[in-house]
Amino acid sequence: MIIKPRIRGFICTTTHPVGCEANVKEQIAYTKAQGPIKNAPKRVLVVGASSGYGLSSRIAAAFGGGASTIGVFFEKEGTEKKPGTAGFYNAAAFEKLAREEGLYAKSLNGDAFSNEAKQKTIDLIKEDLGQVDMVVYSLASPVRKMPETGELIRSALKPIGETYTSTAVDTNKDVIIEASVEPATEEEIKDTVTVMGGEDWELWINALSDAGVLAEGCKTVAYSYIGTELTWPIYWDGALGKAKMDLDRAAKALNEKLGATGGSANVAVLKSVVTQASSAIPVMPLYIAMVFKKMREEGVHEGCMEQIYRMFSQRLYKEDGSAAEVDDMNRLRLDDWELREDIQQHCRELWPQITTENLKELTDYVEYKEEFLKLFGFGVEGVDYEADVNPAVETDFIQI
């Protein structure tokens, strides 16, 4: 079939398998061009490995460090009549390309929050790798099914205390609007922490540790975003921020646990990027369009792959073997360039000036839209979108 983009709200309901593969190839090419990561781990588990920072982590480990990788994710495969999710095609492409280079790559597809996912992953590690040297936790899900009760808990992207009103962009109509978001209830805050906090990360590490599949010196990292006062009301000071603070709590507990055998646990604070997750957060698309333009002008813009390569090579696995620089909460900070005072001051001054008329001129909004479509495999250079493609892609993913 010939597949065209169809947008509904914050998601594109169609995906292009060839475009998704081209995206993965692009990230691999970048990683190889940077050269090998000297002290990289050799056996890596990535939970949430099919898109965004998780996918880039798997690419950095495999193509930057020569690692054997296991990926866990929850994606829908395509049929001959209907495309699957972008993450499905990303993961399929990664496996194919890794194996072509003689790298071990296996994936498990299903609910990473479940006990079954943890058990099947442990079984696979025991069978194929023995142990792992690194665990990346990169889940971004709006819903968590509680393993013991089957209850579905949902997160809320809302402020705390009072209604938040701000200039935002309606990405469907490309117009500037006033967006208002009602505050979260106590219940919604609690639920957001349950879904997006550190509990499941702890459950994963504890299960892996109890099963004896964490190697001595194993490092684990989970991803977070803090941002600046421009986004704090909806993000860091909102329900989502409470969940991210819980991630810090979990990191502290896990760091003590893994530290006993020479390992470590850190939260890595990353910069804002165009992802399905960030596009759903009010205000983020406009902020991203502004900050990207300034960062590009300053020569410090990074996408997922650049960020993660820098995290591996300049933080966690430095060439000289020295310890990573961390902030006062023991976090790895990769948002350092985005938070530069000149860049933030530019955004603060620009924010009130943005109108529908000057949006495309004063910000990288056009590029934002292009990057958003790229997430789903559209608008990728060198892909023939008039060509007939088969959305049913063969994989040997292990079903959870």
Curated annotation (Swiss-Prot):
PANTHER family: ENOYL-[ACYL-CARRIER-PROTEIN] REDUCTASE [NADH]. Belongs to the TER reductase family. It comes from Vibrio parahaemolyticus serotype O3:K6 (strain RIMD 2210633). Substrate binds at Y225. Its EC number is 1.3.1.9. It is an enzyme of class 1 (oxidoreductase). GO terms for molecular function: enoyl-[acyl-carrier-protein] reductase (NADH) activity; NAD binding; trans-2-enoyl-CoA reductase (NADH) activity. It catalyses: a 2,3-saturated acyl-[ACP] + NAD(+) = a (2E)-enoyl-[ACP] + NADH + H(+). NAD(+) binds at residues 48-53, 74-75, 111-112, 139-140, 244, 273-275. This is Enoyl-[acyl-carrier-protein] reductase [NADH] 1. InterPro entries: Eno_Rdtase_FAD-bd_dom, Enoyl-CoA_Rdtase_cat_dom, FabV-like_NADH_b, Trans-2-enoyl-CoA_reductase. It holds the Pfam family Enoyl_reductase. The gene is fabV1. HAMAP family: FabV_reductase (MF_01838).
